[in-house]
């Protein structure tokens, strides 16, 4: 009886761990998001060649977030990070209308990978503070998210520099990864 109670208690209150892969085109704001979540402040970034990885503690959950560079020459390396990924954060520069089709193509190419079949998808429609930014509905349309029938997905408007929307995204991830496990 005591052992059963101990197992139940630890399941309810133990820190959960989640492996998150954050990708998107270059200059979408991935590294800014990562360090805003980790440190609570804006850091000066340079283009990521390779990856940054940080553990973000939030609401009794330990998110291990892999931020992988988005330049076209290094996107083929994304697949090396797919294994054991529970949640995929795809960051889009909502102000970059010229490259939203490129973003869509990269997103769908990734989602067709077998290793990501069970990962939930969170899209951060970033840079919402800019006056010409596309809203979440327009990004949903341009990325073809409604065509994702076999995928659990959500889009969250964000502003990496203020932190707006970031924790709402983590809330969605934590409840939706937890229900899938």
UniProtKB/Swiss-Prot annotation:
GO biological process: intracellular protein transport; vesicle-mediated transport
Keywords (A to Z) from UniProt: ER-Golgi transport, Golgi apparatus, GTP-binding, Lipoprotein, Myristate, Nucleotide-binding, Protein transport, Transport
Pfam families: Arf
GO cellular component: cytoplasm; Golgi apparatus
PROSITE patterns: ARF
GO terms of molecular function: GTP binding; GTPase activity
Binding positions for GTP per the UniProt entry: 24-31, 67-71, 126-129
CDD domains xref list: Arf1_5_like (cd04150)
Localization annotation: Golgi apparatus
Main localization, broad class: Golgi
Lipid attachment site numbers (N-myristoyl glycine): 2
Free-text function comment from the UniProt entry: GTP-binding protein involved in protein trafficking; may modulate vesicle budding and uncoating within the Golgi apparatus.
Database matches in PANTHER family: ADP RIBOSYLATION FACTOR-RELATED (PTHR11711)
Entry similarity comment: Belongs to the small GTPase superfamily. Arf family.
Record-given protein name: ADP-ribosylation factor
Lineage of the species this protein comes from: Eukaryota, Viridiplantae, Streptophyta, Embryophyta, Tracheophyta
């Amino acid at each position: 009886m005591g052992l059963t109670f101990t197992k139940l208690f630890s399941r309810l209150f133990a820190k959960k761990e989640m492996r998150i892969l954050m990708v998107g085109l270059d200059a979408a704001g991935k590294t800014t998001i990562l360090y805003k979540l980790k440190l609570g402040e804006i850091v000066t970034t340079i283009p990521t060649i390779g990856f940054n990885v940080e553990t973000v503690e939030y609401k009794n959950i330990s998110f291990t977030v892999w931020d992988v560079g988005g330049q076209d020459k290094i996107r083929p390396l994304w697949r090396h990070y797919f294994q054991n990924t529970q949640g995929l954060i795809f960051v889009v520069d909502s102000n970059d209308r010229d490259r939203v089709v490129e973003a869509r193509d990269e997103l769908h190419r990734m989602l067709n990978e077998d290793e990501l079949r069970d990962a939930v998808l969170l899209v951060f429609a970033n840079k919402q503070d800019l006056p010409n930014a596309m809203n979440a509905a327009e990004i949903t349309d341009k990325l073809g998210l409604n065509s994702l029938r076999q995928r659990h997905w959500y889009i969250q408007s964000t502003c990496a520099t203020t932190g707006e929307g970031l924790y709402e995204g983590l809330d969605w991830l934590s409840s939706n990864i937890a229900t899938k496990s």
